[in-house]
Amino acid sequence: LHTAYRRQRQMCIRDSFDGFRTSHEIQKIEMLETEDLKPLVDQQALSDFRNRALTPERPVARGMAENPETFFAHRESCNPFYEAVPEVVEEYMNEITRITGRKYGLFNYYGDPEADRVIILMGSATEAAREAIDYLREEKGEKVGLVSVHLYRPFSVKHLLAAVPKTANRIAVLDRTKEPGANGEPLYLDVKEAYYGLENAPLIVGGRYGLGSNDTTPAQIMAVYENLQLPEPKNH
């Protein structure tokens, strides 16, 4: 993501993972070699970035004030740069896939290619979801799937729609946050907007999981799929 950041006019990109569930986990990992990743980094751009860093040795003032008559237009003028980010990130993800053999995408799909029920979420709970999907497919013969979100902002509607099987008629979007008073949590609202106005759009419901670092189990994920089978699935 940070190589994409330097490529895309120094736009800010933040890597995120879910709190204690990931940060305090003991796990065996396979590190990527620096020499393998080095060709992905524009060394001149990296040097330029470091030279622009704020330091007491070269004090500068930036963005101190902007008048109202220009601020609105200025904020809107950055839209094309944000709109280009998904394609740039996807390009670098494809390079990482080529180097490591690990499949990375803006949205990764796992499950039956003709799934009728799909869960959309991001973070460590995707591992529990994969276990639930394997069980339901192998033991129950159910057509279920999962879409894992890897690039949340900017949110690419095109890439999301490409990741979800066309056979999906019911979708559950799970957020690891609660926004009291809102009609739904952020990811749920993004997915609803993505399907707004489309012909034969699936039924979309929302839910929450893992608040306060509570573990999300495969059994809980299976309960979500069971809810999607109901004539009127519970929403939130």
Spans of model-derived segments:
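Short acidic, glycine/serine/threonine-rich loops at helix termini
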Residues: 24-31, 131-132, 159, 182-186, ...
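Redox- and metal-dependent alpha/beta enzyme cores, enriched for Fe-S-associated oxidoreductases
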Residues: 113-142, 155-162
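Short helix-loop-beta junction
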Residues: 91, 99, 131-146, 196-197
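Conformationally flexible catalytic loops at phosphate/diphosphate-handling active centers
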Residues: 15-108
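Single conserved hydrophobic/aromatic residue that forms the stacking wall/gate
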Residues: 1-13
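Peripheral docking tails and interdomain loops at the edges
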Residues: 170, 175-236
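Core nucleotide-handling region used for phosphoryl-transfer chemistry
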Residues: 141-170, 174
